[in-house]
Amino acid sequence: MTKVADQKLSRAGEKNFQWAKAHMGALTTLAKKYSRTKPLEGVSLGVCLHVTKETSVLIDAFLGAGAAVKLAGANPLSTQDDIAAYLSTRTEVWAWRGQSSKDYDWCIEQVLGARPTQLVDDGADLHVAAHRSRAKGIVGGSEETTTGVVRLRAMQAAGKLAYPVVAVNDARTKFLFDNRYGTGQSTLDGIMRATALLLAGMKVVVVGYGWVGKGVAMRARGMGANVSVVEVDPVKAIEAHLDGFGVSSLEEAAHWGQLFVTTTGQKNVVPYAAVEMMKEGAILANAGHFDVEIDVKTMLSKAKSVREVRPHVDEVLLPGGKKVYLVAKGRIANLVAAEGHPPEVMQMSFANQFLAAVRVHREHGSMERRVYGVSAEDEVARAALKSMGVTIGAQTKEQREYAKSWEA
């Protein structure tokens, strides 16, 4: 049975659903096309995604294609309660903002208890939970995030992956736009909503220079911040340097940075020892999926006091008397303190999720127990271009033949 914060919020949720839908033409075009043939008829989808207005458009597409859907939120603090209420009028939902870890795990168990045949995940918590005891009957799934794909590839390497999974995150139409432009804009949106401080002139330290880090660094510089990058990969460090950013070690940056944003998907990239070196008033925020990038556990265990000074901002008084500020409790700032990615970006990511579900249903019998790349990049890109009002040309026959030739 559905469990959401407040069913009375459903009308507000429907309005936000309609707003997002109007700005997600790539997904809605595909949804309309596939609603005629119902390619997901008979499929039971277990879904664990951030319950946002954009996600509601994907759920609508799944339902229109004939699937039965059971939904849980992908983070204890990211659910938009009005959207959860609206979706609960159309399918079963277990999601509300402000869950405990126990609540979060319980919601995932409700989805798995419905015996889905395919999984759609963000962060791989649903996949991992299924592998503990409920993988039987699941024919395949998909994964949205860098973090989740890393976990699933580790499972594959260990010989533990029980079914094929499509790595939506590997799609160019996902990581080039969602990870970079989506996270770049929405992370700063979350930080600015939470702190209400001026970014212009601020010394911002971006930890990690993958696609997410690139997006955050680019947007922070666009707001007038003085941006430096911390990176352990020498190639990415060169890239950051040639992109015009300062590059330093975390130990160096800790002494002068004012805002630190983690973007790596790794654990303890800002350890407590670095926090101790930071200047009075330093702000820490995380753009990664899990709350492990900043060593929040150690910091809070050693703190003399912790108090909320603004919504989504905790003041942490360190043993030496210094104060630092933690945004969104170290969880994913763009979804906790703001609304997540813009719909124009999510139209592509979720179009890939939609097509991945169709692919798994059609092809799972011939797929191996491993992580697969996406297979419909052009279809998604062309639908997105159309929704943006952009037209492009095509190669001529002569050019296609030249590309195949090897003689001068």
Language model region names:
Residues V4-D6, K15, T28, R36, ...:
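Ligand-binding pocket scaffold of soluble enzyme catalytic domains
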Residues M1-L40, L71-T79, A84-M202:
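Glycine/serine-rich phosphate-binding loop and adjoining beta1-alpha1 elements at the start
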Residues T29-K32, L63, A124-V128, S133-K136, ...:
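Rossmann-fold NAD(P) dinucleotide-binding segment
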Residues L49-G66, D178, G182-W256, T262-K267:
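Glycine-rich phosphate/diphosphate-binding loop of Rossmann-like nucleotide-binding domains
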Residues G73, Q118-G123, R134-G148, Q266, ...:
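ADP-ribose/adenylate-binding Rossmann-like module
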Residues L9-A26, G42-S44, T52, Y163-G201, ...:
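Adenosine-phosphate binding glycine-rich loop
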Residues G66-A68, A135-G137, Y163, G224-A225, ...:
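A short helix->loop->beta-strand "cap" motif at the edges of active sites that frequently abuts
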